[in-house]
Amino acid sequence: MSINIEQAIIHEISQDSQGQLRCRLRPQPLLNSQAVEMMLEELHQTYTSKSGKGFGYFGIHGDDGEANPAFSNALQEYRAGDLGFVEFTGQASKLLQEELAKYDFSQGGFLLMSCYTSMASDFLFVALLSAKSSMTVLDDMELSQNNHLDLSNIQLAARIDLTEWQADKDSRKYISFIRGRAGRKVADFFLDFMGCVEGVNTKAQNKTLMNAVEDFVASSDLTKEERQQCRNKVFEYCSERFDEGADIEIKDLADELADQGMESFYDFARGGCYELDEEFPADKSTLRQLKKFSGTGGGVTISFDGGHLGQRVIYDPISDTLLIKGVPANLKDQLDRRLKGE
């Protein structure tokens, strides 16, 4: 396993017959069974691989608007040994219930909270899971309907880097969270119950890094192939950091490029007009543009590796056209069949 589980528990928040939200609290932590280990390992991997996560910190009431300090205060007591895990998670469940009661779109769910260690850091994972209906075949070959936790489609989840939180009080990114397909407004209650305030615009930082890389290669004496190698190296480094759940470090990235003979990127990035933090989380979807060009519009979708530009793919900005040399075999087959049919 890639994680070492300390404790985990599930509480339920559901509607009663009058439509009021109620908490059903589990009186003790989950046993460290194989089922629990498999569930948390799957959730850890699924969460870590999610791109486009937001990052924030525990807000201060007044300085950060109406940020509620109740969750972070209880977490502090738990970490100090003044509050048990069951009591802490029970308080958190009631905070979430109170926050959910302000909205009319939620049916509740199962609140999973787990403390675990991964790569020498302590984490608190918090997720509101939903049940999903499925069918199974019984021993007598009859069908039966049952419910199971939908682990592959988590939309309301956050992970707190407890080690960073307690070691660096000035950090603004020790809480990561899934933004959710439904948009930020629906996920607001999940951040509000923890008193979380967004602190780092990950996409903006990654976009700025990408711009700095493009300006760096454009101002260098590198050949076209070497420029693409530089882009590929940056993407490779950032992808590795993303997969490890670690931050991009500008100095570390510059050292990687220097090893490839591309000196002075650190001074270039820090000395220019780029407002780059020394460290920030990676966003694969943004940085993928270093390797690929892609776009959709008017019923046309095009995607190709950056190395093909100027060779297999010719762009003419004056005529607003793309010329593709060597049509992919599967596309060529479809086009030939259509022409024969006409």
Swiss-Prot record:
Its main location: cytoplasm. Keywords: Cytoplasm. Signal peptide: none annotated. Pfam families: NA37. GO terms for molecular function: double-stranded DNA binding; single-stranded RNA binding. It is found in: Cytoplasm, Nucleoid. It comes from the Bacteria. One of its GO terms (cellular component) is cytoplasm. NCBIfam families: PRK00378.1 (NF001557). HAMAP family: NdpA. Belongs to the YejK family. This is Nucleoid-associated protein Shewmr7_2293. It comes from Shewanella sp. (strain MR-7).
